[in-house]
Amino acid sequence: MKKIEIIEIPIFKLNKNSNKIEIKSTVSSMDHAKELKNINEKLYNDRNFMLELAEEQGYFLKYAKTEFCCDKELVIKALTKKDFNNERGVYKFWDSICETLRNDKDVILKAVSSYSMRNIENYFPTELFFDKKFISKCVKVGPHCLEFVWSEFKLDETIVYNAVKSNGYTLEYADPSLLNNHKVIMAAISDSGFGYEYAPLKYKKDKTLALKIMKKNKSTSPYEYLDISLKKDFEIAKLAMSVNGFNMFYAPSEVKNNKELATIAIKSNPSAYEYLDKKLQKDKEIKKIYNLVNKYSD
């Protein structure tokens, strides 16, 4: 298996003589963004340079001039990156943005789209938190917001549809009454199968639907969440194992005992061998295939 090379970003002790490359590299680290205060005044006041920094990450705004924290173009650029997580989230520097922009719809939508600003009740002005039209837009670009919207909106078909269409997993946060809504369920699961685990049983027993979804997006598979009757189905199991042999982990004994399916699964992902029936693991042909595939995957 090819090793992933980890590239360390160089960090500098910034001062008035630091160049742009050193500043960008250092400020891109949240732990060292405060070094921005030490750079020369010309660059510290240079809006164009601040726009360049905003392309890296937005946390530097905590240490930038107040006027830049009120600059809509700059702030939106700082919010554009989607690599924020719970540790590097928008909320880490949201309070540094001026109040006017924190109440601006364009800015809020951009923040929500970063996927880290989920608990919107803590950040949205009251009038926008209860604004159905605006919330509908928010869940389109930041579907995980559905978890924190007003409970009445979790009952709203349009809002929930927009969220699950963007990310099927957010079906988890919909009001249970909407789990009987065919339009909503299909919006969640039809593209990639995400959200299948929250769908009613009849969808998990629908072979035609399962095959259609599995063939449409071969990088993912809802096999884990299908009804046992479909997991046993040879056609379904064959397709699931060809997508990712790890699906053998979720397979019933009838599939774990099947030599043809085992072969397909191992060729797709050698880890499938671990989940085969013990007798099949001892099969000479299966062991040969596993050893061969495993050799070239290392």
What spans do the regions from the language model cover?
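Non-catalytic tandem-repeat scaffold regions and their flanking low-complexity/translocation tails
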Residues: 4-298
